A protein has these predicted regions:
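Heptad-repeat coiled-coil signal-transmission/dimerization helices
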Residues: 15-19, 52-62, 96, 129
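Active-site-proximal structural segments of metal-dependent nucleotidyl cyclase/transferase enzymes
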Residues: 18-49
Length: 155
């Protein structure tokens, strides 16, 4: 158990460091960025996979549908952070819905996504991670398959 706690702490430090780099860049150039926390449920066998697409959530499919400069950070076994530079709350919400559409199309199963935006939800890495984690939304197909769903434009 002690090993897992140390591993978890080390991983969170690495993620916080990447988020802090993006915060410094945002301060320097005067723009915001968003942090998406993507959590996959137990219905996906091994989470996000670079090697085993198909039964798992494919890293390449997710990366292909994001912008080239968006960063996907592998956190723990079933949680991933997506850093979206130069993205405000509205654009990150559209990206979240695009990920939900991909989950439905590729039959990934249920996923949860939380969003935090720099300056709106926090000024440092810890507060952004905490805000996004608290806002994890449960996703199920019946909630998303509604005629009033927003038409998603590529951001």
């Amino acid at each position: 158990m002690r090993f897992f706690e140390r591993f978890k702490t080390t991983k969170l430090k690495l993620e916080a460091e990447l988020i802090e780099r993006e915060i410094h860049r945002s301060k320097r150039f005067g723009y915001t960025f968003s942090l998406l926390v993507l959590e996959v449920t137990n219905s996906i066998p091994r989470g996000l996979s670079k090697l085993l697409p198909g039964r798992t959530l494919s890293f390449h499919t997710l990366q292909k549908n994001l912008r080239p400069y968006d960063k996907i950070v592998n956190s723990l076994v079933r949680r991933y952070y997506i850093i979206l530079p130069q993205t405000n709350k509205i654009a990150s919400d559209k990206i979240k819905h695009r990920i939900y559409e991909m989950a439905e199309y590729y039959k990934w199963g249920d996923i949860n996504i939380g969003i935090a935006t720099y300056l709106d939800d926090g000024n440092d890495a810890k507060s952004l991670i905490k805000a996004a984690t608290e806002l994890l939304e449960d996703y199920s197909y019946r909630d998303f398959n509604d005629e009033t769903t927003i038409q998603l434009a590529r951001v």
